[in-house]
């Protein structure tokens, strides 16, 4: 079984002031998934411009200040949930158009958190869909949080990858982003940035100048932290550039693709 993450920065126009799909990328990636046709696949996608602006504006996941703030957060939670659900519909539409039996799974309907971390997730349906040859599609979402100071949390696609991988133990985990992997510096701003072929610990990140793209789910360093937790349990992953035509298809077929592997201590 393969778990494939599609970054929000690839399938949406993340810097857009309004939620916007990157339709060219989304349809091409869906076509590549259809061409590769892996025997067992689960897809996790980020929220991009459909989630981060709203979660940030309403400070979902930070401590609630007073009753008025709580009322505002409730609305922000519902608004964010609605927008990311719309993105998921676009993703499933693109997959279905390629003949892929994509089944939408709304995280806020079966996941709860405590202090921003997943505390409960009933994955029995996901297992059943996989056994039936379906492709479950989950996504970064907002969920209820049992920490009374927060009440609501953002659960990133990367945290979902970590959680589901530990419980489903896939053979491979592939993360498609908008860069070739993890660099020593932001490659979009620094031509001399060097690609890291392997990361085995957070010590390997000391040369990074912060995150590549800071957002409410932690940016690139947040992604790597999640993947290192996963690697410690024996599930390695690879970060590749999903914006490069053919990369997703080759990765799903098991072919070598330029990128960064996240391993245990090395």
Swiss-Prot record:
ATP binds at residues 5-9, 48, 178, 183-188, 219, 223. Gene3D superfamilies: Acetylglutamate kinase-like (3.40.1160.10). The keyword Nucleotide-binding applies. Pfam families: AA_kinase. Optimum pH is 6.8-9.7. Transmembrane segments: none annotated. The record marks 14 as: Transition state stabilizer. It is an enzyme of class 2 (transferase). GO terms for biological process: terpenoid biosynthetic process. CDD domains: AAK_FomA-like (cd04241). It catalyses: isopentenyl phosphate + ATP = isopentenyl diphosphate + ADP. Optimum temperature is 70 degrees Celsius, but the enzyme is not stable above 50 degrees Celsius. GO terms for molecular function: ATP binding; isopentenyl phosphate kinase activity; kinase activity. Homodimer. NCBIfam families: IPPK_Arch (NF040647). Catalyzes the formation of isopentenyl diphosphate (IPP), the building block of all isoprenoids. Has lower activity with dimethylallyl phosphate (DMAP) and isopentenyl thiolophosphate (ISP). Has low activity with 1-butyl phosphate (BP) and 3-buten-1-yl phosphate (BEP). Has no significant activity with geranyl phosphate (in vitro). This is Isopentenyl phosphate kinase. It comes from Methanothermobacter thermautotrophicus (strain ATCC 29096 / DSM 1053 / JCM 10044 / NBRC 100330 / Delta H) (Methanobacterium thermoautotrophicum).
């Amino acid at each position: 079984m393969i778990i494939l993450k599609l970054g929000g920065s690839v399938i949406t126009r993340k810097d857009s002031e309004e939620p916007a799909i990157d339709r060219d990328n989304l349809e091409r990636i869906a076509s590549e998934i259809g061409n590769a046709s892996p025997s067992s696949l689960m897809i996790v996608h980020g929220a991009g411009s459909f989630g981060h602006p709203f979660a940030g504006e309403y400070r979902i996941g930070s401590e609630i200040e007073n009753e008025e703030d709580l009322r505002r957060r409730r609305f922000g939670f519902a608004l964010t949930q609605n927008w990311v659900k719309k993105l998921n519909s676009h993703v499933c539409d693109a997959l279905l158009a390629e003949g892929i039996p994509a089944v939408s799974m709304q995280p806020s309907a079966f996941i709860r958190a405590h202090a921003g971390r997943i505390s409960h997730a009933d994955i029995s349906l996901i297992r059943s869909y996989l056994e039936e040859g379906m492709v479950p599609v989950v996504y970064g979402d907002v969920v209820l949080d049992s920490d009374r100071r927060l009440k609501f949390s953002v659960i990133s696609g990367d945290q979902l990858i970590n959680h589901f991988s530990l419980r489903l133990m896939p053979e491979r985990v592939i993360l498609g982003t908008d860069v070739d992997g993890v660099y020593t510096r932001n490659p979009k701003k620094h031509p001399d940035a060097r690609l890291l072929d392997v990361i085995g610990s957070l010590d390997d990140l000391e040369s990074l100048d912060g995150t590549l793209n800071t957002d409410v789910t932690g940016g690139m360093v947040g992604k790597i932290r999640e993947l290192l937790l996963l690697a410690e349990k024996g599930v390695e992953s690879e970060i590749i550039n999903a914006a490069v035509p053919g990369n997703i298809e080759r990765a799903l077929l098991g072919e070598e693709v330029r990128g960064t592997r996240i391993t245990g201590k090395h």
